Amino acid sequence: MGCFGCSKKSSKRSETNKDTVINRKIVGGTTSVAKSDKRDDQTQPSSDSTKVSPYRDVNNEGGVGKEDQLSLDVKGLNLNDQVTGKKAQTFTFQELAEATGNFRSDCFLGEGGFGKVFKGTIEKLDQVVAIKQLDRNGVQGIREFVVEVLTLSLADHPNLVKLIGFCAEGDQRLLVYEYMPQGSLEDHLHVLPSGKKPLDWNTRMKIAAGAARGLEYLHDRMTPPVIYRDLKCSNILLGEDYQPKLSDFGLAKVGPSGDKTHVSTRVMGTYGYCAPDYAMTGQLTFKSDIYSFGVVLLELITGRKAIDNTKTRKDQNLVGWARPLFKDRRNFPKMVDPLLQGQYPVRGLYQALAISAMCVQEQPTMRPVVSDVVLALNFLASSKYDPNSPSSSSGKNPSFHRDRDDEEKRPHLVKETECEGSS
């Protein structure tokens, strides 16, 4: 979705925008929406459950014009009916144009695969919002729009961005979200303005734990469970007090059910975050998201990008750079973001790096389940580091604020990482 919290137009997203999809094909053709007099009223937040066709070409013999076909897509999906009674509202295009001053350039926040994002104010709600407008020539389209609306209309969690409403009018497709004043995690890690204070260790662990809880909700709490498939720094938005929320659910898929272990699908996602097993086989699992989360956790710890083309070839891929260093704890201090200036707890660093190493294991069966990741990161986030304490430094005795009893309460994954310290 890009940055919700920026206040001026910027070209800083050009690199991120280019890597929205892997091996993605823009499908054309004349397939129309499958319609039936009797529809299953059960809404599922996945492209599996929404049979949406690409646009029909207006020049096709007997075809339907693009504007008409887009309207038919929504009607055939009963989109408005499916979100009735949910928290999402429907808006007219005129309402959203007025909210953004007719999409003025000074309201522009950012741009992603879906389209441009604008800041606006919905007068009748007296609420500042972020409005994402579908680029009809972009890499994402009606399918992703529908999946996003269905997913967020069904979801309700403090670590998922709130969908306020949508517009499906003529050929216009827009999504209206709560406004996230601190922008994206990417803004604070990789495009930090000169003079702006970098995220401290405690805030980084807070963001990691919150993002993990959002992922846990998708995997373990939603019915049916959902595979996110697009977890990355630019999709983690930050609210007041840096409360993290996952955003951009257009690529989400319903997870495997019963005795199935995976969902076979086209490979889509972002290079650098995509699990190698999924990229090679097209077999999507919940562990695919765990890999992506491990990359994000590495970014939080190191301050490096998932893919950085300014580095030497062998160091461009963050996971490829980190794997040899995971093998020896003595390398761990070399991996820390220099912007932290040594202000981090050594034990907390070891544990966080070991968790990320487990998440980015080559073999998906070796990666932890999300509930274990949440337990471990909740523990690290609650173990506050005080840089002003006499015993606080990146030396031998890092200072944690916690009860003595916490030693017995440490989750299994944290204890395991202390023993191993590497993958």
UniProtKB/Swiss-Prot annotation:
Q: Which GO terms describe its cellular component?
A: plasma membrane
Lipidation positions, renumbered (N-myristoyl glycine): 2
Question: A biological process (GO) annotation for this entry?
Answer: defense response
Which Pfam family name is an example for this entry? Pkinase
* Low complexity: bias regions: 383-398
Q: Where is the composition biased (Basic and acidic residues)?
A: 12-22, 400-423
Q: Which residues carry this modification: Phosphothreonine?
A: 92, 265, 270
PTM: Palmitoylation at Cys-3 and Cys-6 are required for plasma membrane location.
Catalytic residues at 230 (proton acceptor)
Domain of life where this protein originates? Eukaryota
Would you indicate the residue range of the signal peptide? none
The reactions it catalyses are: L-seryl-[protein] + ATP = O-phospho-L-seryl-[protein] + ADP + H(+); L-threonyl-[protein] + ATP = O-phospho-L-threonyl-[protein] + ADP + H(+)
Q: Could you tell me one molecular function GO term of this UniProt entry?
A: protein serine/threonine kinase activity
- Entry protein name: Probable serine/threonine-protein kinase PBL5
Record the organism.
Arabidopsis thaliana
